């Protein structure tokens, strides 16, 4: 029997890309999905596909930059399923541009989604996980959380922050004996709508060229599944998943 069967899994950014792929993969293993994103029509479609395949999924339209909405999402999961076993903290954006272009609004948005959104989600699920003395928080960082490159300075900063948050949370929960696992997943180039969040034409042209080597989101979904499937005394803390031909 799969270690995933009947686990209650919240996925943010579930309407496309890695979030959508993870939802389908985990549902096929018997998880009960709580899907969160801003685009309701996408969530409805995904829920329908999962249920048509025999899986279980509910959804709630959620903006991760709102702490109140994240708390409501966790409360909804607890109301419907009675527990939260896994959080896949996936929502993120990737605007790229050189600093001198002063894309300040995009900096603010990245910080709100990629850092505050991650923190709000953790804060929303942590109390119930600590109370039940089990849980698994999976944060999506990036290869950009390990490297820095021109044009990606702020994005890299947010993804380095996700890695730091993941490791800090891991240490805190390990020393507290709560049996909460923390996994940081750092994808390389993956086919998704992430490129659409870059408005700067120069940066977008470079990204479009680089992303010709991108792998499918299913590859990351399988890695997430692998981490969840481990026995409760085993924690996969860090995974870097690149296309084989990706250099940096």
Feature names for model-found ranges:
Residues 142:
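Residue(s) in the substrate-gating loop at a strand-loop-helix junction
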Residues 180, 184-185, 203-248:
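C-terminal helical subdomain
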Residues 40-41, 61-73, 104:
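The beta1-alpha1 cofactor-binding region of Rossmann-like NAD(H)/NADP(H)-dependent oxidoreductases
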Residues 122, 158:
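Active-site helix of classical SDR
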Residues 8, 15-16:
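Conserved glycine-rich cofactor-binding loop
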């Amino acid at each position: 029997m799969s270690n995933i069967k009947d686990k209650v899994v919240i996925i943010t950014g579930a309407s496309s890309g890695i979030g959508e792929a993870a939802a389908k993969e985990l549902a096929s293993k018997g998880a009960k999905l709580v899907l969160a994103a801003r685009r309701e029509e996408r969530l409805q479609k995904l829920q329908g596909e999962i249920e048509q395949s025999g899986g279980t999924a509910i959804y709630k339209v959620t903006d991760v930059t709102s702490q109140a909405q994240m708390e409501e999402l966790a409360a909804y999961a607890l109301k419907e399923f009675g527990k939260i076993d896994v959080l896949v903290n996936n929502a993120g954006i990737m605007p790229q541009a050189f600093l001198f272009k002063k894309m300040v609004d995009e900096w603010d948005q990245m910080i709100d989604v990629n850092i505050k959104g991650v923190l709000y989600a953790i804060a929303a699920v942590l109390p119930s996980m600590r109370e039940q003395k089990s849980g698994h928080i999976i944060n999506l960082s990036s290869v950009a959380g390990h490297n820095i490159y021109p044009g990606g300075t702020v994005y890299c900063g947010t993804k380095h922050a996700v890695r730091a948050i993941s490791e800090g949370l891991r240490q805190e929960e390990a020393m507290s004996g709560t049996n909460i696992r923390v996994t940081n997943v750092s994808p390389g180039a993956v086919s998704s709508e992430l490129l659409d969040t870059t408005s700067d034409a120069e940066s977008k042209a470079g990204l479009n060229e680089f992303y010709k080597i991108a792998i499918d989101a299913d590859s990351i979904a399988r890695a997430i599944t692998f981490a969840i499937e481990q026995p409760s005394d085993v924690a996969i803390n860090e995974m870097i998943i690149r296309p084989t031909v990706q250099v940096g």
